[in-house]
Amino acid sequence: MKKIAVLTSGGDVPGMNAAIRAVVRKAAFHGINVVGIKHGYEGLVKGYLEELDLGSVGGIIQRGGTHLNSARCPEFKEDAVQQQGIENLRAAGIEGLVVIGGDGSYRGAMDLVKKGFPAVGVPGTIDNDVPGTEYTIGFDTALNTVVESIDKIRDTATSHENSFIVEVMGRDAGDIALWAGLAAGAETVLIPEEDYDLDDIVARLDRGAARGKKHSIIIVAEGVMSGNELAKLIKEKTGKETRVSVLGHIQRGGSPTARDRVLASQFGAHAVELLMEGKYGRAVGIRNHQVIDYDMPEAFEKNHEADVSLYTLMKELSI
């Protein structure tokens, strides 16, 4: 194998640049050239290619976002569009592709594999919702951003004796909400994987107030409902106002944590090894502190499951 390509797809996450860097440097170590595909699958179809070398990836490991830009490309589901992408790759002499992204990105990569083009996947999503791996690139940074934000919100909540609802990302997965809730000492956490009980939420707030607590923090993943919707339900139930803070896209940005940089470096390097070994249609992941790989369809054919033990602990500690 003499030339491979790398692209980032879907939502950007901190650590993608570290993964791109690792792909380029690992490939260079083995004498393999790397081409970067700009703007994800859209760039693959439109031929937005650029040569990457050691200089191209110098000084990017600490940067958030993605050096290659990212975009969503719904039309890539079409056979003719996929075939155009493969033709562009082959015309450029590219023999394998590393795709960094979430389950949707993996589906696109697997479509290429089914059409005979070698591709492997690297998990990059702040939601930490790719089945088969315990952690994804970007989750740790996003989690730290959320916890830091909640700490600051709690400062003002304490000063003004207010209750706050903090809405975080997580359309189908509640890992950010759950982990942040435990780390920030939230009174209540609502995640998509578990049913919520409004009476229980109110009871928890009342128990805190009964022992003299003047403020509280409720975290809700966007996939459950919006923070404003929850505030309305609580007011209808109790007559009390709760402030709402929607963290939004701040969760995607920022310099990646050391953990995300290391994880991304391990994942990117292992992806190159898979291509060199002729192991296509594989996804990189980590389990029990070991970098592993597994069949890519497992990453999008199974549903993400929340850590039940963490959820139970969260409820026990927020009595």
UniProtKB/Swiss-Prot annotation:
It is found in: Cytoplasm. The keyword rRNA processing does not apply. It comes from the Bacteria. GO terms for molecular function: 6-phosphofructokinase activity; AMP binding; ATP binding; fructose-6-phosphate binding; identical protein binding; metal ion binding; monosaccharide binding. GO terms for biological process: canonical glycolysis; fructose 1,6-bisphosphate metabolic process; fructose 6-phosphate metabolic process. Mg(2+) binds at residue 103. It catalyses: beta-D-fructose 6-phosphate + ATP = beta-D-fructose 1,6-bisphosphate + ADP + H(+). Pathway: Carbohydrate degradation; glycolysis; D-glyceraldehyde 3-phosphate and glycerone phosphate from D-glucose: step 3/4. SUPFAM superfamilies: Phosphofructokinase (SSF53784). Its cofactor is Mg(2+). Substrate binds at residues 125-127, 169-171, 222, 243, 249-252. Keywords: Allosteric enzyme, ATP-binding, Cytoplasm, Glycolysis, Kinase, Magnesium, Metal-binding, Nucleotide-binding, Transferase. Its main location: cytoplasm. ADP binds at residues 21-25, 154, 185-187, 211, 213-215. The keyword Transferase applies. The active site is at 127 (proton acceptor). One of its GO terms (cellular component) is 6-phosphofructokinase complex. Allosterically activated by ADP and other diphosphonucleosides, and allosterically inhibited by phosphoenolpyruvate. InterPro entries: ATP_PFK (IPR022953), ATP_PFK_prok-type (IPR012003), PFKA_ATP_prok (IPR012828), Phosphofructokinase_CS (IPR015912), Phosphofructokinase_dom (IPR000023), PKF_sf (IPR035966). Homotetramer. Belongs to the phosphofructokinase type A (PFKA) family. ATP-dependent PFK group I subfamily. Prokaryotic clade 'B1' sub-subfamily. This is ATP-dependent 6-phosphofructokinase. The gene is pfkA.
